[in-house]
Amino acid sequence: MATTPAEFTQQSLTYTRMIDLSTGIEHQAVHEPWPPSIRRLRHDVEGLEWMERAFGIERSQLTQSGGLGPAFEEVTAITHCGTHVDAPWHYGPTSEGRPARTIEECPLEWFFSDGVVLDLRHKAPGERIEVADLGAALAAIDHVLRPLEIVLLMTGRDRFLGTPEYFEQPGMTRESTLWLCDHGVKVIGIDAYGFDRKFADMAEEARQTGDASRIWEAHFAGLEREYCQIEKLVNLDLLPRPTGFQVSCFPIKVEGASGGWSRVVAFV
C-alpha cells in the first residue's frame, strides 16, 4: 500500500539493499540519438591552469596537492539522455487545462514512493501495451494500485542497451496511460528507450492510414492527465519482488526544463 509523505517513518524506510535502476550520461553513447559530449578537464592541465589563474600562484607553490589542480567536466547534453524524468511541459504547454509544470515545478512527493513492477516482457517490439495488459500484470501479482505508487514497466529491452535492437520496443497507448493516471499514479517508468512504441512503427502506421493521432499517443496523454514518465530504466529484473519496495527518482532541477536526469534507486 502506498504511503503519503507524512506517513513515511524511519521504520518504513528500512531496507536491506539498494538497486540502481539507472543508465548514466556517457560520452558519445551509441544508444543516444543525440549523444552527450563530455570534455574532461584534467588535474595536471586545465585544473592546474585554473588554480594558477584563480589564486595567482605557481605550480611549485601547490605543495599540498602535489602540484595539481581539481578535475572538472564540461557536459553538453539534452535533458532527455540517460535515465531521465519527463515533466508535463515535455508533452505540451498545458496539462489538464492548466499551464504544464516544468521539471523543477513537479512536487517532490511524486518522486519517492512505493514501487510496483509490472512484467510485460511478453510484449513484442512494436506492440501496444494495452489496458488489458496492465490489468493482467496486476492480477498476476495480486495487487491493487494506490495513489502515488510509482509504476515500473518491465519490457526487458534494457538488455539490448548499446545495440540497434534497443530501439525495437513495445509502447504504452493513450488509453493505458490514462488508466494508470486515473488510479492516482503520477510517475510511470519503463526500461526502454522511450515510453511510446518505436518511432518507425508509429511513422509507418501514420503513412499507411493517414492518421497521425497514434504518434506519441502516450506522451500526449499528458495533455489530459498530469503525470511524469521515466525513460531508459535498467535492472528491473533484479528486483526480488514486484511490490514491497520503494523508489527514489528525484530529477535534477533544470530551470524551465521539459525533463531532468535522475539516479533512480530501488530500496528493497
Where in this protein do the model-derived segments appear?
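Active-/binding-site microenvironments in catalytic and ligand-binding cores
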Residues: 1-268
